[in-house]
Amino acid sequence: MEVFQDYAYYYNIFYQDKDYRREAEQINSLLRQYGKNIGKIMDFGCGTGKHDLELVRMDYQCEGIDASPYMIEEAKKNAEKEGAKIKFSVADIKSFEPSGKYDAVLSLFHVMSYQNTNRDVLSAMTSARKSLNENGIFLFDVWYGPGVLSDKPVVRVKEVEDEERTLTRIARPVMDEKENVVSVRYDVLVVDKKTNIAQMFCEIHNMRYFFKPELDLMLQEAGFELIANMDCNTLAETSFSSWTSYFIAKAV
């Protein structure tokens, strides 16, 4: 079962309430705090490109890659609609070979949590290191282990709509505490408002949750120095209530 196939088409609808502007402002603040002269950015796992559109408005030069051709198709449509000059390409972050160097690599909305094995995580980190100038910044977010174990995932239902359709998504998580992975089954019901015709599809997203010591070690192996991590929502120090965390590393 391919991840982000049917789901990609409806991705923008499901996350229409996501505050990309606020998140981009957070990223801008962190890049200015921990980086120097950040101008050129590569986005690993760019999805539909919404973060990049916001960052371009802040005068960054952005490019994005994603393993899902369906996501890249939507990203290109979004950029064209906004008149933004952003290069979006289909590529796997685990094997990406950059044609140039960047001042920062971003990997947002838990893309690194989709890397379930140590090998995959290290491969993605190595790709990021290859992509960076000396002292470049690698900024990513993940599901944060202490928070996930303190407030374990439960079944959730989300209902959204646009002018043409209504969508209902049921997320059913199953935890594998030996592998630190949560397998989330998404069952999605789409109903056309005009015809009342319904269709259903399912995707399974396997999400790894991480702990700081293991990421610190893997970053070192990939050629980075971990310089900061914090709660994604508050930018305060992480705690047992932090479900997601930013990690910021410098290329060394």
Protein language model features and the residues they cover:
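C-terminal lobe and adjacent flexible extensions of AdoMet/dcAdoMet transferase-like proteins
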Residues: N206-V252
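Class I SAM-dependent methyltransferase SAM/SAH-binding core
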Residues: G49-S95
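A short glycine-rich, Lys/Arg-flanked "PGG" loop and its adjoining helix->strand segment in the class I
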Residues: L122-E134
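SAM-dependent methyltransferase
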Residues: V142-D216
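A short acidic, Gly/Pro-enriched loop at the edge of an enzyme's catalytic core
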Residues: E97-A104
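Conserved class I S-adenosyl-L-methionine
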Residues: M1-G45, K50
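Conserved beta-strand signature within the Rossmann-like core of class I S-adenosyl-L-methionine
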Residues: N135-V142
